[in-house]
């Protein structure tokens, strides 16, 4: 009998220590309130978005220039305007927290420029002076 106790006393001590630790942790969890409570969702007011953002796309160049323009709307969906006379502009008004603003233009004139303005602050502007100019403007977080 002492041979069995002599042989298994270490595993028995480990089992007892693990059991005591489990009971202690369980008691501490109940004392300090770490159990989950379901929130009361019945009284929540809807979140109303305000402070609209005004994103203005502009493509400009010499008079008589015709351009093909691609841009992203407020939902990041691409749109294309073919053979648009410059200067060209498009305004997006949104209450989204972030908008990716992107405009790409290819023109047949000697120069072409693009500009993205957010709430009357110019965030991106590029001008290319080349025949059949190609320009793009990107604001990752408007």
Swiss-Prot record:
UniProt topology in membrane: Multi-pass membrane protein
Keyword Transmembrane helix: yes
InterPro entries: MmpS, MmpS_C
Keywords: Cell membrane, Membrane, Transmembrane, Transmembrane helix
Subcellular location: Cell membrane
Keyword Aminoacyl-tRNA synthetase: no
GO cellular component: extracellular region; plasma membrane
Main location: membrane
Transmembrane segments: 8-28, 81-101
Pfam families: Mycobact_memb (PF05423)
Family that this chain belongs to: Belongs to the MmpS family.
Protein name: Probable transport accessory protein MmpS1
Species the sequence originates in: Mycobacterium tuberculosis (strain ATCC 25618 / H37Rv)
Lineage: Bacteria, Bacillati, Actinomycetota, Actinomycetes, Mycobacteriales
Gene encoding the protein: mmpS1
């Amino acid at each position: 009998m002492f041979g069995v106790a002599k042989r298994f006393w270490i595993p028995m001590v480990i089992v007892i220590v693990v059991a005591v630790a489990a009971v202690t942790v369980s008691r501490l969890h109940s004392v300090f309130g770490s159990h989950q409570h379901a929130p009361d969702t019945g009284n929540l007011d809807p979140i109303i978005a305000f402070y609209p953002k005004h994103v203005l796309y502009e493509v400009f160049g010499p008079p008589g220039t015709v351009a093909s323009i691609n841009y992203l709307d407020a939902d990041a969906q691409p749109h294309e305007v073919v053979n648009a006379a410059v200067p060209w502009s498009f305004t997006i008004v949104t209450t989204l927290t972030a908008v990716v603003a992107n405009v790409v233009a290819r023109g047949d004139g000697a120069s072409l420029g693009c500009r993205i303005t957010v709430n009357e602050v110019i965030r991106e502007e590029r001008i290319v002076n080349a025949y059949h100019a190609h320009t793009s403007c990107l604001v990752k977080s408007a």
